[in-house]
Amino acid sequence: MEMTVFRTKVQRAVSEALGEEYSVELREVQKNNGVILQGLMIRRAQENMMPTIYLNSFLKAYEEGATFADIIRKIVTVYREDAVGKQIDISFFTDFEKVKDRICFRLINRDKNRSFLEKVPYIPVLDLAACFYYAYDGNGVQNGMIPIYNNHMSAWNVTDRELFACAVKNTPRLFPCDIMPMESALEELLEELQADVRQHLAREIPMLILTNAGKTYGACCILYPKVLEQLAKRVDGDYYCLLYTSPSPRD
């Protein structure tokens, strides 16, 4: 089934399952590197929280044999477990003084995110872009992210450089870097191997992973003060840094 047909059927079925008290909308969501995901946004009357549930994995499950009724039940269950009854007061977001201490940055590819970068403030970093978000954590929402758009910057009457100055201070504080050997990151995959095999892999592939404590947007750690210097000391020489970013849809 084509996604355009599938998402329309899902929207109609979820709307019928929840009733007239709920608003169910379709939305295309642009992720990193030009990836477009199909989202279903659900909001109950009198609530201001409207989570997005991505449909791409549900279409795949349907094509692999899941019934359409099962798909709808799963979507409704995900919504009820995660969103019902939650209210977020976002009035604070109009006041720069109230948000400046949680403004952070992430790094994305400039060429692959041109259309997105037209809408947001950012600082060029080589072929990358440091763009900004508010790290929201409260009211039952953990590791939430509110992207900062050009209209926010205008309303706050600040510049992209001022946002960057805040983000450079906040991001390492809220999301400290974590440097680990590759084998530590792959420990679960390697634990079934014999000890001598693991040791051999560690010797033959002496790679390190640089990320942050939240394991999200870890590429930004290359801009943390003295982090690259720490890496040079740890490897005791020159090194190459391979950046990896990927969308993190709610599957």
Residue positions per predicted region:
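A short linear hydrophobic-aromatic micro-motif
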Residues: 24, 237-241
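Short amphipathic alpha-helix segments
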Residues: 221-231
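Short, surface-exposed ligand-recognition loops at beta-strand->loop->(often short) alpha-helix junctions
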Residues: 216-220
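Short glycine-/aliphatic-rich beta-strand segments at the starts of folded cytosolic domains
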Residues: 207-215
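N-terminal ordered "arm"
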Residues: 1-63
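Conserved small/polar residues in nucleotide/adenosyl-binding loops
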Residues: 244-249
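Hydrophobic, Leu/Ile/Phe/Ala-enriched alpha-helical segments that form helix-helix packing faces
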Residues: 10-18, 22, 75, 79, ...
